[in-house]
Amino acid sequence: MAKKEFQAESKKLMDMMINSIYTNKEIFLRELISNASDAIDKLYYKSLTDTSVGMNKGDFRILLTRDKDSRTLTISDNGIGMTREELEQNLGTIAHSGSLDFKKDNKDENIDIIGQFGVGFYSSFMVADKVTVISKAYGSDEAWQWESSGADGYELEPAERETAGTDIILHIKPDTETDNYDNFLDEYGIVAIVKKYSDYVRYPIQMEREKSRQKPKPDPKPDDYKPEWETYTELETLNSMVPIWKKQKSEVTDEEYANFYKDKFSDYADPARVIVSRTEGTANYNALLFVPSHRPYDFYTKDYEKGLALYASGVLIMEKCADLLPDYFSFVKGIVDSQDLSLNISREMLQKDNQLKLIHNALEKKIKNELHAMLANDREKYESFWKEFGRQLKFGAYSDYGMHAELLRDLLLFWSAKEQKMVTLQEYVDKMPAEQKYIYFAAGDSTDRLAKLPAAELVMDKGYDVLLLTEDVDEFCLQIMRTYPRKDAEGKDGTVEFKNVNSGDLGLETEDEKKAAEEATTANKALFDAMKDALDGKVKEVKVSTRLKDHPVCLSADGPLSIEMEKVLSKQPGSEGVKSDKVLELNVNHPVFAVLKAAQEAGDTEKLKKYSALLYAQAQLIEGLPVDDPAAYAEAVCSLMQ
């Protein structure tokens, strides 16, 4: 029979279908199995309203047949089949979809058909140098054979087939230096591809598999009898068909969920929480999500890939769909299955459509609620989770200029100096005395050191708690939030600000105490100016402190950038010039202050310089800052001891 041209006759278009749309050759089998499933769906749907079909759901199957000698792989189904006209229309026209037409014709029915764009069939040519299709439409007496070797066209002629359905025979290419095509004829290679992509197709995918068994023992058994083995073939169903995520939660045990998670996501530990979510309405999907009990080794590196496995009607479309999860929930693993997603023609990349956004938003809300439930009902487990992934939630609250802070703030935990345990911000606020003006915090490298800061001790002496922040992101997180909800004395909604104990006015002094400090600063202006000059630009100001009790000196920051934030930012490339405006605060009631005054009054400028450098270095050490010149500091200490 004469060869026909493809209706979309451009060879360039066929090359694009074969070489550009699909990035992974093994997905050809996923596409052909999905097409077979669609064909069965159509006949099964017809059987529900037409008893003459004479078949029920258990009669349908997809059969894979491999022949290494002839290098063919055949995918057969007993679905609706195709007429000659349908073969020309569906296979002779690139990017025409019979499944899409079927969905349009039955748009008022609840039918789940996978195929939409009609190019999946052409992925066959990635692995086959010739493709033969034999099909017989249901209700027809004729079968037809369609055959093509690629872009040059196809041939169509009568054929023989007993029952309705379709056989797709792939003549597999020989191996090359770069491609192992033999894998598509290998028993284990085929099984692996089916399990990966098509494990949840709802009809059995079957293949003859070679097995071994012991031959029957002779009777009577001779004394020198040795067991003998024989090989045989057996038709085996390769796919599990019923996805665990489509089952009701009451039908699945915790152990089954845990085993599924460990097997699917290659984890050795049970998940910390299982989240089952299914929605019908604006977004139709089934989701099975897991909160891991420990973080992957690469979680906080650029190599980590977030994302959920995305299925369309049980067929794997994407192993890690990043668009389904916000970054702050990137630790969540799981599966989403939807029949409503708009897929592009390769099924490998999703369009940025509204349906995906709806699912993303629904999952975000569900995950947040589940974490809240864990926090409220299983605090020990939540705190274990927090040790692994808490930093990610804090990054989420800080990122995008605090856009997600309100969503995440009640999931955050911080160490309480007073309670000596992790607390939420709400728990801190609930225990605040009525007169307390701020949520106090101190930021540094260890809770022990922070608790001993002069300003932290002062706050705690007042009976107020201090949150001790030890991770780089902590202070940035609180500063971007700025306030937290708090009801006032009359029960009206209000807010309370966060306050670094080493920055600005702590709100602990009376007006009289503030006035006295200001007067003392004015009275000692000459001394403080001399000390500021001696420190040569290292501090913005020297003044009398209202936050010191037993210590002689401390550093505070004037402005939005704290000393701890300076330390964090200085570690970043290109941030070497970022400096906080430091204030050297002195305790006028400490004996050291009298020594300073004596040096000033004696006109001993050199000694005052040394004292200023010593006190500044001491304040740096208290803050956990490196001393600017350790050698000079050591020499100054020694000279004072002589």
Where do the model's predicted regions map?
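GHKL/Bergerat-fold ATPase module in large chromosome/replication-associated machines
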Residues: 113, 131-153, 173-183, 188-642
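GHKL (Bergerat-fold) ATPase N-terminal catalytic module, capturing the glycine-rich phosphate-binding loop
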Residues: 1-184, 192, 215
